[in-house]
Design a protein with these regions (language model features):
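Substrate-binding groove/exosite segments of carbohydrate-active enzymes
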Residues: 225-301
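Terminal accessory carbohydrate-recognition/targeting modules of carbohydrate-active enzymes
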Residues: 1-249
Length: 301
């Protein structure tokens, strides 16, 4: 129901009464995938990585991470093929090509339940040769050249908690405060790699476990990491939400949408102190962030 492709909705449509226009079309730019505390307050899908304003309960003002592609030391300008854009509540995918269309990058990105931001990249070259990926994150910049990980420390809004970001990728090593990896491609034979930024919080020990499984554990494989995150998300619905089917499709659609909206607005940060120590709903999570105290009992239950 929540799947979207391309840049729809784009503000126009057609029904029995004819063509119509409406305001507020988002062009499929907001990222539906989110963690129990982390999400993209704003999202720039036409750039590789998690570009936009990352939120951890609220805005941080930072990108998650950016990714550059270069060939022979020459940075490539990539353009998104928006027709390839597809989004579901558990992942977002799109495709990029360089100017002469010799390089294609298919990106699949998602945020795990415990706030690990993961991007899988499948890269194809029509000519073969070396392709270098360089990734940078304002959250994690500490590490010596040759290390396999960058780290950092960040106090979230109002100093409600501190997160300890960890940033790594398959075959990536630290160079000048960034992560870099060079892939040697055969012509028209795709290779897949991935990057992960874990927004680690001491009060959420699973955030460390989920990150380390992707860093050097049993989910280092991009396909395994993706499958684990998507099936975990889908299983949450099976375990927590009753299935509703009526004779009226519009009723079903409304019920599904409201359940999804409640899930998207849910904050389960387990923060210390008398702030967000319990699950709650943040009404308008991409807007005015009004906590609905009335629903706390329901979410705790």
């Amino acid at each position: 129901f929540r799947s979207r492709t391309g840049t729809a909705p784009n503000g126009t449509g057609t029904n029995d009464a004819g063509d119509y226009n409406y305001a507020g079309a988002d062009k499929n730019e907001y990222l539906f995938s989110r963690g129990r505390a982390a999400f993209m307050y704003t999202h720039t899908p036409e750039a590789l990585g998690f570009v936009g304003d990352v939120a951890y309960w609220d805005q941080t003002g930072n990108d998650g991470f950016t990714v550059e592609v270069s060939i022979g030391g020459s940075k490539q300008t990539l353009r998104e093929n928006t027709d390839k854009r597809k989004q579901t509540p558990s992942y977002f995918t799109t495709e990029f090509t360089n100017g002469d269309k010799t390089i294609t990058v298919t990106e699949v990105k998602y945020i795990t339940y415990t706030n690990v931001m993961v991007a899988n990249f499948t890269i194809t070259s029509t000519t073969g040769g070396d392709v270098t990926l360089t990734a940078a994150s304002p959250f994690a910049q500490d590490g010596n050249d040759g290390d396999t990980e960058l780290t950092g420390r960040f106090n979230v809004k109002n100093d409600l908690t501190t997160i300890y970001p960890r940033f790594s990728g398959n075959g990536f090593t630290v160079k000048n405060g960034k992560l870099a990896s060079t892939l040697t491609l055969e012509a028209n034979v795709p290779q897949t790699t991935k990057l992960q930024l874990g927004l680690i919080a001491n009060e959420l020990p699973d955030s460390t476990a989920e990150y380390e499984a992707r860093f050097n554990g049993d989910l280092t494989d991009p396909a395994a990491s993706y499958k684990d995150s998507v099936t975990t998300y889908n299983r949450w619905w099976v375990d927590n939400i009753p299935y509703v089917e009526t004779q009226e499709h519009n009723i079903d659609k409304t019920v599904f949408y409201r359940w999804w909206l409640s899930r998207f607005n849910m904050l389960d940060a387990n923060m210390p102190g008398n702030t967000f120590q319990y699950p709650t709903s943040i009404e308008g999570v991409l807007g005015y962030n009004n906590q609905i105290v009335l629903t706390s009992g329901m979410f705790i239950n």
